[in-house]
C-alpha cells in the first residue's frame, strides 16, 4: 500500500506550500482524495455500469484521507478544510433541537437578549400572528437598545428571497416595513433576486411560479455569537407542525462572524428594501435582472468567495497558533496563561452552494462523502422533497455503504392538498420515488438501499441532511444540516448553505443519533406494496410531465 499512498502524500504536502492560493489548494486536496482509486471505482460513476458492484466481490479501494496524513491526527474528514474554513469548538457548545416549538421559542428568547447583532436569512417571513411575534420581539429589542442606561449598538440584518417575499398584497416586505421606517439606521432588509429570472421570462411567468427559476434558500438565524442552522423558514407551520432539523451553536464567535459576513455578502448583491416599499441596488453593484448577467454573477462570486477565503485564512492562522501547532501549550500551561477555552472535540465546516455564481462547494463535499462511504458504513439521508440529482443517485446505487433514505409520504408533503397544478406535485414525487425504488430492485440492492416514508397525523415534513456512521460504529461521527435538499434545485438553481459537523464527542454523537432515531421512528419501510395503496396511483399526465419539470422542484 506504500506506493499507492505516495501520490496522495505528495499532493497533501504541496498544500502546505500554498497558503495564499486557496483555490489551487482546494483543487490539489480534491485530487489527493481521488488518487489511487481502482479502475472499477472510476467506472462506477457511469449509469451504464451500475451493475459493476454486483459482478465483483472485491471491495473497491478507497483513499479517504487517513489520519496518518493529518499531522495532528484529529479526524478523517480534515480534507474539507482545503475548501472552507474549519472551526474547532467544544461539543458543549452544540445543542441539537428537536421540535418546531423549541426552535420558535429559542429564536424569540435569543432576539430578546441580543445586544450587538441579529442576522436572519430565510426564504421568506410569513404573515401570521406567530411571525408578527418575531417582528415584535425585534422591535422591542431595538427599542430597548436605544433606551437602555448604557445603549447598545444593536443592528438587525434580514435576508429573504425577492420573489417569495413579495408574493401577495400582504407579504414579507410589508411585515418588515415598520421596522425599516422606525429604525432606518439599524435595520437592513435585503431581497435576493436570481439573475436567471429576467427579460421576457420575468414578464411572462406567473407570480406563483416565478420562484421555480431560482431562490435565496439559506436558513441561518444568528444572535450575537449564537447561531441556529436549520432548513426551517420563518413561517407559522415551521413553528408548530412542520418537522425540520435545527442545531444551536452557542458562544461560537468565529462561526457567527463567518455567517454574518456571508449574509452581508449576499445582501450586498441583493436589492435593498426601502421604507416606502421600493427597492434599490447597492451603490456600484450590477442590477441582478436589469444589468449584464455575466458581470453580476462575477461580482457575486467574488463577493462570496472573498468571505470564504478570508475566513479560511483566519482559521488557518488561528489553528497554527493553537490547536495544530507542534509547540502547543499543555492544557495546564494554557489555563495558567488565562486561556480557559476547552480543547475542541468537534469541527464545523460551512458548505456553500451557489451554482448561478459558479460556487459548488457543498456539491463537491457531498459527492465526496457519498463516494468515500465504505462497506459497513451507514448513511441516513433525509429530504422533504425526494428528487436526488442523477450524480447523487448514481453514488447511492454505486457505492458499498448501507443507505436508509427518509422522505415525506404524500400526506405530509408540503404541497399536499394545494390548489391547481401545485396539487399534483406530491404525485410527481411519488412517481420519482417509484422509479428510484424500481432501479434499486432491478439492481438487487433492496438490502443495502432502503426507502422510508415519514408520516405524522396533522404534520408536514421538511427535514433534510444526513448522518454518517462509520463501519462498526453505532453512533454517527458526521452530520450535514442546513438548507439543501439534495435535489436539482439545491445543486443548480438556489443559494444554499449547510454545515458539516464532525465530532469525536460521545455525548454529541448521542444527540445526533437520538435526532436521527426520532425522525425515523415515525416512518414506514417502502416496499412494492406501498405503491399499490389507494392514492398512490399517478395519473398519466403527471408521469409525462414530471421529467420535464423535475429540475424546477
UniProtKB/Swiss-Prot annotation:
Functions in the biosynthesis of the anionic phospholipids phosphatidylglycerol and cardiolipin. Widely expressed with higher expression in testis, liver and brain. Its EC number is 2.7.8.5. It comes from Mus musculus (Mouse). This is CDP-diacylglycerol--glycerol-3-phosphate 3-phosphatidyltransferase, mitochondrial. The active site is at 217, 219, 224. One of its GO terms (cellular component) is endoplasmic reticulum membrane. Its main location: mitochondrion. Activated by calcium and magnesium and inhibited by other bivalent cations.
